[in-house]
Regions:
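C-terminal motif of bacterial Sec signal peptides marking the signal peptidase cleavage site
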Residues: 8-11
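N-terminal accessory/pre-domain segments preceding catalytic cores
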Residues: 13-176
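Conserved hydrophobic/aromatic pocket- or pore-lining residues that grip, position, or stack substrates
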Residues: 182
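Sec-dependent signal peptide recognition
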Residues: 1-4
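Active-site neighborhood of thiol-dependent amide/isopeptide-bond enzymes
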Residues: 175, 185-215
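Short, well-ordered surface patches within globular domains
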Residues: 179
Length: 215
């Protein structure tokens, strides 16, 4: 949870424009990687319905894979749905859904390339049966985007207390200063919850605001 908090605090901050040695403002170059940090923008995912797939109650919205995420929801008859996402790094990430029809964002953290998205329905106890597998080809607008958007594991919006704290900590700071400020805050104020780490159950979803309370 501490690492998720650092992610949210650093990614949701805002700061002033950097200056060069001559004191002039640094201009963004269209050919360089865009500076996505410290502009006060909250990166919230959307299910626009422009590119969709649906199989047996499993809904995928693939409208924004270039932004480093896709949306998924479940309205089927099983008690649980498991979606596994595996990219070119061959690391499978698993996400659990209730049959409530609510969309959640799933990040595409392995960069450009093909991702295998496999949906499994719970058929009893810890047993799951395959519903379908889809190959999703991804070309990111920028490699940092999968780590900036709110998603199922790092869930935040404009009303999240962590976002408000991030803006407060990083106001007027350069990018490097903002990272340092967040780092100092976390090591001084947040304690790793060893008991929770040892007893957490499958399907647990972190809450970044709850992490703020673990002092």
């Amino acid at each position: 949870n501490i690492f998720l908090l650092i992610f949210c605090l650093a990614g949701c901050g805002t700061s002033g424009t950097g200056t060069s040695e001559s004191g002039t403002e640094q201009q963004e170059s269209s050919s360089a990687a865009p500076n996505y940090y410290h502009k006060g923008k909250i990166f919230l995912p959307q299910a626009d319905g422009k590119v969709t797939e649906e199989h047996e109650g499993v809904k995928l919205d693939l409208s924004h894979t270039d932004q480093g995420y896709f949306m998924a929801a479940y309205t089927g008859s099983a008690d649980k749905l498991l979606i596994q996402v595996e990219g070119s790094d061959n690391i499978p990430y698993r996400y659990y859904f209730d049959p409530d029809g609510k969309y959640n964002a799933l990040p595409l953290t392995a960069g450009d390339g093909s991702y295998a998205v496999t949906a499994y329905e719970n058929v009893g106890d810890n047993r799951y049966a395959v519903v379908f597998t889809k190959i999703v080809d991804v070309t990111l607008e920028n490699e940092v985007l999968p780590f900036l958007y709110s998603n199922q594991y790092v869930n935040f919006d404009e009303n999240t207390k962590t976002v408000a704290l991030a803006k407060k900590l990083t106001k007027g700071k350069t990018e490097i200063e903002a990272v340092q400020e967040v780092y100092e805050y976390v090591i001084k104020n947040i304690v790793y919850d060893d008991e929770k780490a040892a007893t957490v159950k499958s399907g647990y979803l972190p809450n970044v605001d709850d992490t703020l309370k673990t002092k």
